[in-house]
Amino acid sequence: MNDIFAIPFKRALQINLKDAFTVVINNTFYQTAASVEADLTQLDKYRDVLFHLDVCQADLNMLKQYYMALKAIAVKLPDDQVEFTWFNTLGLKSSGMTRNSLRFETFNVLYNIGAMYSSLAVEQRLESTEGLKESCRLFKLSAGCFKFIYEHEVSNNFKFFDEYTLNALVSMMLAQAQQMVWKKACFDDIERHSILSRLALQVALFYQTASKNSNCSPYIRTDWVKSLTSKSHYFMAIAYYRSGLHQVQKQNYAQGICDFQYALTWINKLSLDDELTEWRGEVQALLESAERDNDLIYLQASVQNPSKVKPVMMVQADLFDEIEKKDGNIFKNLLPIDVLESCNAFNERVETYVKEHISNPLESMNKLLISNTPQYMDFKSYYISEQEWNSYSDSLQDLEQLRAYVAGELKLSESILQKDIQENEQMIREHGLLRWKIPSKDKKIESLLADLTNIRNYIENGMKVDTETASLFKTLDHDLVTNVSQPPESSDPIMKEASLILQGRKNHILAAERKIIENRLLPKIVSYYKKTGSKDFEPVFQEHIRMFDGDLLQVQKEKAKNKEMLTKVTLSSPEQVQISRNDPRTLYLEELKHSSNVLSELKENIISGKQFYQDLITALESKLKEIEDYVNERKLQRTELNDTLLCDTNES
């Protein structure tokens, strides 16, 4: 029962970490990966230790370096950009897990640091006091690693690790740390039965918790579960064996007898080797001796319950010094992701500021001026894009192709019926009309031919509509509806002035938007962060938006100009309204409106035309199947009748 557990290292799948992070940095940052190439190379070297781990202080230090480097880059990169795969090694079969997460990689490296501490603890000289103390320290650090992962996984809903497995590992490491304390106490004074009992009971309780959680874990092997259970029973037996010695030492023989009996119940649950068999004999002998002394000398009344031993916990999970630290030297030149996110947030604030204080007011003024200027004409709603124009042309060609397909299917259907009629006529010529009883055109054939004639009429009508639609499209002026030919200037002086004001405001909005693009906040925020280390970028934002002070002043001027213009429009004479009726822009708009109406009619014709041909295709496919089935039936009838007539001829 003196054997102790070392947690096996998890295994990782090899990846080229440098290449993976290079892609992420180049795609995510305004910086290039070349600026941190040396750091990426170093990170790759750190990760190499995962694939040739030895139980030694040097490899532990390498694991810690990699762990701290990961924590350094984790605050500067998105978490979900690189895929990592790790394999559990606690069971007889290895099972893998793959996640796109830097945190997943970081916690698995921390897991291996915990495993390394446990392996180093096992390798200490446990026959010496110093060896036991060092082993205890290392087991506590191992427990600290697993507990640290557990506490972070609670908030992560255990996406990366199993809850029971982590709990089992923490309890297992604490049990072994407590076991080292108990063993050292045995070395120090084997006769201090009370303290040894209390220390042993806490060891038993730790192992008991580890056993329960291991049993619920999907990863921990069964023989470990059994061993943990046995260890719990073993130290429970030790606790009450020592308690019995303590009670006998105090001449509480009845209580001592009860404790020895209780210790034996735990011993009997164990698989006994030679050493345990010998110890059971020793406990049995002590029990019998105590019973004899009590019966002959002390005559104490028998006790039914074992002593209430109070466990004493001498260990807790400890954290190694670097567990919360980041490597301060690696990736120094790479900006943290939250700084970049702040840049994006402040860029959005700049855009919102320009929209609220410049774009929206100018657009509102334009709308107000247009709504109060009846002569003003807005052509934009009537124009179509070159792509939309081409879509009309392509749709007309689609109609032609659909019509051609339907005509081809109709021709095929007609040819099948005509061939059947001709074959039947040939049989009539061979056997004579009196002997051949199958008509060339029965009612069904006549009905099918009539249906095909109706479909042909539909196709011809569709062709007429298609021709009219195509002719309608040809009447349109491409340059007019696609705004290739710009609208003429108005002859109305108020309209001319209004148009200039409206266009000037549109240009001002575009200029303000260009100013946003050409003067990004990112360089200023980067410079401010490098100078101060502060992530409070509000002063940078306030200084940045001062570039729009001139635009804000222009907005105020435009407000005054809008009032002046609205007054002019209100006071405009009826003659100006008459001018607008003969205005070149008015005539241009009328032609554009007419073209827009034609396009609406075209669109409706194309949509209904496509549906028309789709319906015809469906009807023809159904009719063709009906024709083929009936023609096959008639062929079978002709074959049977022909065979019968030939047989009669031969017999006669």
From Swiss-Prot:
Residues 3-369 form the BRO1 domain. Signal peptide: none annotated. Coiled coil: none annotated. InterPro entries: ALIX_V_dom (IPR025304), BRO1_dom (IPR004328), BRO1_sf (IPR038499). One of its GO terms (cellular component) is endosome. Required for the proteolytic cleavage of the transcription factor RIM101 in response to alkaline ambient pH. May act as a scaffold protein that recruits the calpain-like protease RIM13 via VPS32 to its substrate RIM101. Belongs to the palA/RIM20 family. Interacts with RIM101 by binding to its two YPX[LI] motifs. PANTHER family: PCD6 INTERACTING PROTEIN-RELATED (PTHR23030), PROGRAMMED CELL DEATH 6-INTERACTING PROTEIN (PTHR23030:SF39). This is pH-response regulator protein palA/RIM20.
